[in-house]
Amino acid sequence: MRRNKPKKQNHKEKKKSLPIRLNILFLAAFVIFTWIIVELGIKQIVQGDDYKNQANKQEQSEVSSAVPRGKIYDRNFNAIVTNKALNAITYTRSKSTTQEQRLKIAKKLSDMIKVDTKKVTERDKKDYWILTRPKEAKKLISSKERQQVEDKKISDDDLYQLQLKRITDKQLNELTDKDMQILAIKRQMDSGYALTPQYIKNEDVSAKEMAVVSEHLDELPGVDVTSDWEREYPYKNLLRSVLGSVSSSNEGLPSNLLDHYLSLGYSRNDRVGKSYLEYQYESLLQGQKAKVENITDSKGNVTGTKTVSEGKAGKDLVLTIDIDLQKSVEKIIEKKLKAAKARPSTELLDRAFVVMMDPRNGEVLTMAGKQIKRENGAYKFDDYALGAMTSSYAMGSAVKGATVLTGLQTGAINLNTVFKDEPLYIGQDKRGKKSWQNLGPVGIQTALEKSSNVFMFKTAIAVGKGEYKPHQALPLDTSAFDTFRNYFSQFGLGVKTGIDLPNEMTGYKGTSRLSGFLLDFAIGQYDTYTPLELAQYVSTIANGGYRMKPQLVKEVRDSNAKKGIGAVVDSVQPEVLNKVDMKSSYIEEVQAGFRRVATKGTAAGQLASASYKPAAKTGTAQSFYDGPDKSKTGTDTYNTTLVAYAPADNPEIAISVVVPWTYIDYNQRYSITNEIGREVMDKYFELKSKQDKEGTQQKNKDKIEENAENTTSSDN
């Protein structure tokens, strides 16, 4: 019996410990469930939205949309570059849209619109053929090749390349016109990036096409009807080469400018300025793109949008150009070129240039260049205004003002210097270096008036510290080349003018330093210069020695859809590049000589009767042909030039006229540059009087504002 007592005691102890364990278990369970409830509460209440987004895999992505590009006006507010609104149909693909889904949409769209198929490539056709004929495409691959993919000996891409390679011309010819329409549409849908609108059609979209697509948008996920724009030129081809161009919506960033624009934060499909003014002022004309935030669901479909920032249209440019003057000048050039081609010895003549600046501030009033060619028995003209800053020529005696001033400033000559104009015979040269006739004793003003070559030769010899002795060698200090070029550059000859356009060029600098070439340099027959350099040179003489930076943009204005003309954002100030290192009395002497050229010298026949009192210098340079007809390269010919400014006592315009390869035979010479110069200056003062009388600038501004108000009212 005693042996059983311990067992009873153990049983009682077990009965006592059981409730304790249960209590501990219940307590632990309570704590755990309480913790779970609290955690769930935190997840649902505090972090509910975050987890909801994660569960739905919502994503937010920012997309930019283009805004209207800035307009370009001339100095009198004539619109010369505007934007033309275009109907457009776009497609925005989601991140999860499949090839098959896009194909289905493309098929539906092909029943509603007609698109251009010219850009469809052979590769596009093959991709489409494989996509639309999966069974036939499968037959192009052997079971052995499929096994190689499974064995990872070749990739899926390798397999696809084999399919592409094995598609025959016969199979591609199966594609119908309908297929090509579908393919062209799908090709556009596949381009670009997800969530970024792509233009399916933005040229010649009819009102009917817009209406039909609009009615079926619910059947066309991602498709939208919207608008696009293209640059419009009210003055057609006038000044087009200087205005530049803009890339198309299909082109996006041009390949040659890709890195440049990407570094500035542009997207690859952005439309941008490609050349000249459109490129130079891209940052102003482009504007600020609108930014929209797309919210997508787990399938990548857009479920909502939110505007992050409103876009702002590009700034408008007001140019220094007078477009009415530009138009008149181009007509004058065309008329004179056409008349000249009827004369003998002009078979190489094919171009002419006129640049007009305001010497007081550097504003370019006109920059014209024309090329003439004969096609189908008639003359045709092409714009070549850019040639005024990208092509260079020997300018002849027009640069003699700079030669005289170099001689004066170096002390080689003085205001009272008189040289006998007579042929110079250097070494074994029996022809002699001479003027167009023996002029006898000439001072500075007479030398300019009668265009004495010999005066310039003797000035160059003095600058080069030489001594002329007939029929003997003429040793000169070759540093004289540097001296001349230094002073010439102060007027803008041989250096970039600084015009606000890209790709400006300077002329050719002769490399030989033989004495004879220094004499040629002094009369403008060695180094070459652009017509724009020549205009800056004469402008510097006209204003008393200040080299002004040529400007094409006068003002930058805000775009204002309601008022038409926005407020001035920036007014371009005149910029003095340098003051020539010469005494005022020296410049005045040359100015007096230029005035004599116009009144009784080599330009008197055309300019003496002008009421606006011009000053001028003519030029004829023995040159050689270097134009497009390569079979004639090197042919001896003559360039003719004119520089002028007016009025002589208070200049407001300065011009250069350059006609390369005017004639081959010197005996057939004529004054085409003088004639062009006279008519151009006449037209300037005629238009100025008319514009001042009629208040042209204010009238144009009022008209723009009236049109803007009418447009705004009709939109409302």
Curated annotation (Swiss-Prot):
Where do the TM regions start and end?
22-42
Summary of the knockout phenotype: No visible phenotype during vegetative growth rate in rich media, no difference in sporulation or initial spore germination. Spores have a significant delay in outgrowth, between 60-90 minutes cells swell rather than elongate, upon eventual elongation they have a larger diameter and are often bent. Single deletions have reduced peptidoglycan (PG) synthesis and turnover rates. Double ponA-pbpA deletions spores have greatly decreased viability, PG synthesis and elongate poorly; increased levels of Mg(2+) increase spore viability.
Q: What is its EC number?
A: 3.4.16.4
Record carries keyword Transport: no
Reaction it catalyzes: Preferential cleavage: (Ac)2-L-Lys-D-Ala-|-D-Ala. Also transpeptidation of peptidyl-alanyl moieties that are N-acyl substituents of D-alanine
Q: Which domain of life is it from?
A: Bacteria
Region entry Disordered, spans: 689-716
Active site per the UniProt annotation: S397 (acyl-ester intermediate)
GO BP annotations, alphabetical order: cell wall organization; peptidoglycan biosynthetic process; proteolysis; regulation of cell shape; response to antibiotic
Q: Which EC class, in a word?
A: hydrolase
Q: How does it sit in the membrane?
A: Single-pass membrane protein
What subcellular locations does the record give? Cell membrane; Forespore inner membrane
Gene Ontology cellular component? plasma membrane
UniProt-recorded Gene Ontology molecular function terms: penicillin binding; peptidoglycan L,D-transpeptidase activity; serine-type D-Ala-D-Ala carboxypeptidase activity
- Where composition is biased (Basic and acidic residues), the residues are 689-706
Induction (free text): Transcribed during vegetative phase, drops off during sporulation, rises again 30-40 minutes after germination. A small amount is present in dormant spores.
Annotated metabolic or biological route of this protein? Cell wall biogenesis; peptidoglycan biosynthesis
Q: Which UniProt keywords apply?
A: Antibiotic resistance, Carboxypeptidase, Cell membrane, Cell shape, Cell wall biogenesis/degradation, Hydrolase, Membrane, Peptidoglycan synthesis, Protease, Transmembrane, Transmembrane helix
Function (record text): Involved in the synthesis of peptidoglycan associated with cell wall elongation, especially following spore germination. Has a partially redundant function with PBP 1 (ponA) or PBP 4 (pbpD) during spore outgrowth. Plays a redundant role with PbpH in determining the rod shape of the cell during vegetative growth and spore outgrowth.
Task: Give the family from UniProt.
Answer: Belongs to the transpeptidase family.
- This chain belongs to the protein called Penicillin-binding protein 2A
